[in-house]
């Protein structure tokens, strides 16, 4: 392998990626301190070299001239005076091109700027001692696409946005492969800054600054680039997380295969538009959860279109984190419940908001709908704030007295099943697990009121309306518990569609809109009626413990967990279970993900038809 110019740039000890030890760069690459990229800046501001047959570098006619290559600096775009050690140009002979379409995430991969195929660096024998997985600051052409028939690799200077993106991608990948419960959010001081400091020379050709001002700059960069990074500035109220762990940052798009370099040629641009490639950022509209996620994507969208969409007062909804719910949100408490809202694409005449008669008036709820995530997870808002939910929303840790969390989706008819594994149950801790209706008290144990039914770890007692009865032996750490419910399909609840919430008030919290619903607990309790032929059954390590309850109260039931002190449990909504029941037929709770989307969409459409919203010519408060 022959290297062009003065030789390779910043060197590190042998070994690719995070295993390499950093060393100092050359004097030609020194800068006083890095500056955060401006709004909208990213890898696209550092264009890749486009070699041509007419370009040549002194000493080798087959190597490209990189003396005019542009790169990011604190003063914007500057032209390098020479190749020096500020970049690496490698031109190597390779026997064949990797034709595999599969990715090797976690390895140093390179994307060809012409054919857009991905290759591992080992395919061409490229020295990766100064490289990291998920890097974006390079230009690469495979030996088939390059005019010389050799492989072209140029390592460029990275701006802070690219460095933060690479750091978070590597931290996310490490957590996925090493942690039992992978994280998606990482502490600025404990995770991100130490990672960048350790691998600075692997992440950029820029000289490590003498002044320690770059940590503040990376925080500003990630806080500003909300189309790429998630930001959580403070722990949830009542959380045990120490305040010094915050702010925390994560990637908005958790698909790490979307991370790649930014090439200027049109072929790469079109490929990025189609695939939603991060290219140092996230393509506008490529992510976003909820029922309208796919519809929001603009095929062949342009920057002008994106800006226009953002200025729209109705459809300027914020993009959601990977798990489908805002990091900072209102909690269901004090007699009020909050349902995340998104623009309803089927609502007629959304332009009416621009009329003068709507100035200063609340946005009508019929223009929005409940925002549903297609996966069943533990609810972030429908829980006691002191409970700690894992990043994947499948594990919960208790805190002090009994408190409860419900799942994001509930069932109104049919037979359903889910599992819970007791991960940790220290002495003097306990759990009550089972099913709850939406009005079940979150600051009380499951089974406290008429709206919930539970199974306690101690002595296996079952609870409903705070009345405990012997049911089975208890359970503890390591046990896998199953929860089955069967609701008849001939009840009024079963035949009804879910609430559209369109008649509820819309409130704004941290840039997101929510429907606000008042709880009428006393009225709901008086209207409860038993449902014949309904039943709840619990399982312990695959063994049926018998029918716990029959003829339960009619309603919509959610999987629910209540914990006493620092007990930790994980929930599995399916479709694969460790101990699937063999004596019953059922649907896994995971099926309710798309099932709820269908039900709510039908309810929304019927609402528009039945209320004749299209014919409304004035606000509802006007005659």
Swiss-Prot record:
Ubiquitously expressed, with abundant expression in the heart, skeletal muscle and kidney. Low expression is seen in spleen, lung and testis. The modification Phosphoserine is found at residues 96, 311. It comes from the Eukaryota. Its main location: nucleus. One of its GO terms (biological process) is positive regulation of transcription by RNA polymerase II. Both monomethylated and dimethylated on arginine residues in the C-terminus. Arg-291 is the major site. Methylation is not required for nuclear localization, nor for MLL complex integrity or maintenance of global histone H3K4me3 levels. PROSITE patterns: B302_SPRY. Residues 84-95, 265-277 have a biased composition (Polar residues). Residues 355-578 form the B30.2/SPRY domain. Interacts with HCFC1. Core component of several methyltransferase-containing complexes including MLL1/MLL, MLL2/3 (also named ASCOM complex) and MLL4/WBP7. This is Set1/Ash2 histone methyltransferase complex subunit ASH2.
């Amino acid at each position: 392998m022959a290297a062009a110019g003065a030789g390779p740039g910043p060197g590190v000890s042998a070994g690719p990626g995070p295993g390499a030890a950093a060393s100092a760069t050359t004097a030609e690459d020194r800068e006083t301190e890095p500056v955060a990229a401006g709004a909208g800046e990213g890898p696209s501001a550092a264009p890749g070299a486009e070699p041509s047959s007419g370009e040549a570098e002194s000493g080798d006619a087959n190597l490209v001239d990189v003396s005019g290559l542009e790169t990011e600096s604190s003063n914007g775009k500057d032209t390098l005076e020479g190749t020096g050690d500020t970049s690496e140009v490698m031109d190597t002979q390779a026997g064949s091109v990797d034709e595999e379409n599969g990715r090797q995430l976690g390895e140093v991969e390179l994307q060809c700027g012409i054919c857009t195929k991905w290759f591992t660096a080992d395919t061409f024998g490229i020295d990766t001692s100064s490289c990291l997985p998920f890097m974006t600051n390079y230009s690469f052409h495979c030996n088939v696409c390059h005019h010389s028939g050799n492989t072209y690799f140029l390592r460029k200077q990275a701006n802070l946005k690219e460095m933060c993106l690479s750091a978070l991608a590597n931290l996310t990948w490490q957590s996925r492969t090493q942690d039992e419960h992978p994280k998606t959010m990482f502490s600025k001081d404990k995770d991100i800054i130490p990672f960048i400091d350790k691998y600075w020379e692997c992440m950029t050709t820029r000289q490590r600054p003498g002044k320690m001002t770059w940590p503040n700059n990376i925080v500003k960069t990630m806080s500003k680039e909300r189309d790429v990074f998630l930001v959580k500035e403070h722990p949830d109220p009542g959380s045990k997380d120490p305040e010094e762990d915050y702010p925390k940052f994560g990637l908005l798009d958790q698909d790490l295969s979307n991370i790649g370099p930014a090439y200027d040629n049109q072929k790469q641009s079109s490929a990025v538009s189609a695939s939603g490639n991060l290219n140092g950022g996230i393509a506008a509209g490529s992510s976003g959860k909820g029922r309208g996620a796919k519809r929001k994507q603009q095929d062949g969208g342009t920057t002008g279109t994106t800006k226009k969409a953002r200025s729209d007062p109705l459809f300027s909804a914020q993009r959601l984190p990977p798990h489908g719910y805002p990091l900072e949100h209102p909690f269901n408490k004090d007699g009020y419940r909050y349902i995340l809202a998104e623009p309803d694409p089927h609502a007629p005449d959304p332009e009416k908001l621009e009329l003068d008669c709507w100035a200063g008036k609340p946005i009508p709820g019929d223009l929005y709908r409940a925002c549903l995530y297609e996966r069943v997870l533990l609810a972030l808002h429908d829980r006691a704030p002191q409970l700690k939910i894992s990043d994947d929303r499948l594990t919960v840790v208790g805190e002090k007295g009994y408190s409860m969390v419900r799942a994001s989706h509930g069932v109104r008819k049919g037979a359903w099943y889910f599992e819970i594994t007791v991960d940790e149950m220290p002495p003097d801790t306990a759990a009550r697990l089972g099913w709850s209706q939406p009005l079940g008290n979150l600051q009380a144990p499951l089974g406290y009121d008429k709206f919930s039914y539970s199974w306690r770890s101690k002595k296996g007692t079952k609870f409903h309306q705070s009345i405990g009865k012997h049911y089975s032996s208890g359970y503890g750490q390591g046990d896998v518990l199953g929860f089955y419910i069967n609701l008849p399909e001939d009840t009024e609840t079963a035949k009804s569609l879910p609430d559209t919430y369109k008649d509820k008030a819309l409130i704004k919290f941290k840039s997101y809109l929510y429907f606000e619903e008042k709880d009428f607990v006393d009225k709901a309790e008086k209207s409860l009626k038993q449902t014949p032929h309904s039943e709840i059954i619990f399982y312990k390590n695959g063994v049926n413990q018998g029918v716990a309850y029959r003829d339960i109260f009619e309603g919509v039931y959610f999987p629910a967990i209540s914990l006493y002190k620092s007990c930790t449990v994980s929930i599995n909504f399916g479709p694969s279970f460790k101990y699937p029941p063999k004596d019953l037929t059922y649907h896994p709770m995971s099926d309710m993900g798309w099932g709820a989307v269908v039900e709510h969409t039908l309810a929304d459409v019927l609402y528009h038809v039945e209320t004749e919203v299209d014919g409304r010519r004035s606000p509802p408060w006007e005659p």
